[in-house]
Amino acid sequence: MKHTTIFRSILPLCIAGTALFFAACEDNEETEEIGSLLFESKNVTLALDETVQLRVRLYRPGSTENTWYDTTANPYNLQWSSGDPSIASVDAQGRLTGHAIGSTVIRCAMSDNSVHATTRVTVHDGTGESLAAELSRPFDDALVYSRSVYLQRNTIMQSFDIETDGTLWYLQLGGNDPELLYVLRGAPNESPKDYMMLRWFGHGTNFAVEEQGAERYIWIGSNGNKLSDGSYSQSNTVSRLKYSPDKNRKLDLCGGDTFFIKDKWNVHPAIDTDNDILCITASTTGVRDFIFYRLSDALATPLSKVTLRTQTYGGEDADSPQKTETRTIEAHDLTSIAPLGSFTISVPGKDNLSQYDFQGFDVQDGLLYFYEGEAAGKQPKSIAFVTVLDISGNIVVPRTQVGAINDVNALVEAGICSSDSNGYIEAEGIKMKHDRLYIGFATHGPGAKRWANVFRY
């Protein structure tokens, strides 16, 4: 699927710097006082190799003039600069060009630096109109990457990932053992052959698999909290742990490298190893945060003692009595390093973003893929949406309804769900891999069997 740019978000005017400036003049001219310099937007998004014209205004005290500055003539000799020209460069007339995936700051200033302004620029890979059109299309059997896979327990998958060679990974709830999460690995269209069990980690809404030679590392929310119904959620930390399949051993609470962000919980990770990006989402009532870090910076952060929120866990068997405690552990404290960017959305947010249940996210090439939806039962019919944003939260591809799950009869005929399931198909997991978008769905087969399905766009 070839990606093309659809639009660039422009936000309201913002003041980025103020000062007083007396313009250069001939001997017989009055000096002219400049009060402030303003960019058109505090955030600009553009695609690789795209060139756009940046616009600014100069404001004079007491003046009502409200026109764009003539960047071509440049009568005040404004100076333009980029914090990282390898990501985005800007010429003497304010023309901006994207060169590499990432984010940097563009500065515009008077020649003596007495007045200046900045705007943050994000360069992405150009995903746009073609993706929205693909997602809107009706069901076609060619969309199915893997269908009707029964996992280890008769519960729905929560998320999935895909290796470079096409191997599928799943994260599944423990069913009658609500303290467990299963991490499973298998070929498309086949039940997984091996798995490992995680105990008291959380709900597993999102996870990621990191490939390192022959080894695989799982990024997942950890140090979960037991809710009143016995289920687990509200992960306090994110862990990166080596995949070690063992059907007789459980890993408790966390493992491997564990990462902490002060005052953030309900945390889930996504990674883009090619571009050295770690993104962590955290949620509280009414809001969801997305925070971006250099993956290498996160791994290099030294271990320190951190105190978690009070958590309850255990009590599922006689050997593990229930505990409620405030624990101090050693972790990589990401609060100590500067993020690359972040944004927060309300629930529901702009353009109805996050109107439905959050079903996962992924990051790739400077973009964040946001997945939401609900199954038939909560809604008259199953529904799912994908929205693509940049690392500043600007919408790059508008919220698009997934058309492939609208025709229940077609899904039944294709063996995705059964005729006695009332059209149950629930969005579960999203990944952008190898220039293709993969979205997951949990369905019910005959006899209420739970199936995992993955579509590819």
Residue ranges and their predicted role:
Residues 21-24:
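C-terminal motif of bacterial Sec signal peptides marking the signal peptidase cleavage site
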Residues 153-165, 203-216, 263-279, 354-364, ...:
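Structural signature of eukaryotic scaffold interfaces centered on beta-propeller domains
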Residues 180-189, 232-246, 288-301, 305-311, ...:
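Beta-propeller blade signature
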